[in-house]
Amino acid sequence: MVKTNTNKLTDDQISEIKESFDMFKSDNGKLDNDQIKYAFKALGCEITEETLELIKKKGQKSISFNSFFELVSPYIPKRDSMSTLEQAFKLFVKDGSGITFKDLKKVAINIGEECSDSDLYDMIEFADTDGDGVINKSEFISLMTTKKVL
């Protein structure tokens, strides 16, 4: 695995890596190979099959946050933020038309997130600013670039 200088990453980038890891991790607190791929894509990065094979050859069935951080952090400064958001959008929908309830439910199931149908509909309603029942790319980008205020 690649060692990196965390000084090259901003606090926001480090938080983003942690959020991606937390979103896809298993109950054991680690990522398996499929979850690693999803977490990379959510960050707008692509992991090579060769890298995944190296992980397997080391006998690892899953990796910890520290290993994931070392693996993904060299990719973070090189990515373009708009293409990152477009990659994340594509995680939800394959045809590019928008994120539907069905798409959101499928992703929730794939990442092991237990959400009620009501919660999923609330998420869509919150992000769907034009009221058509679908989260289009611009709504998704707007949602993802809005600072959370707590």
From Swiss-Prot:
Which Gene Ontology molecular function entries are recorded, alphabetically?
A: calcium ion binding
| A single GO BP | regulation of centrosome duplication
Q: Which GO terms describe its cellular component?
A: centriole; centrosome; cytoplasm; nuclear envelope; nucleoplasm; nucleus
Highest taxon of the source?
Eukaryota
- Residue limits of the EF-hand domain? 12-46, 80-114, 115-150
Residues binding Ca(2+) are: D128, D130, D132, E139
User: Cross-referenced Pfam families, in alphabetical order?
Assistant: EF-hand_8 (PF13833)
Q: What does this protein do?
A: Plays a fundamental role in microtubule-organizing center structure and function.
Q: Which family does it belong to?
A: Belongs to the centrin family.
PANTHER family given in the database record: CALCIUM BINDING PROTEIN
Q: What is this protein called?
A: Centrin-B
Q: Which organism is it from?
A: Dictyostelium discoideum (Social amoeba)
Protein encoded by which gene: cenB
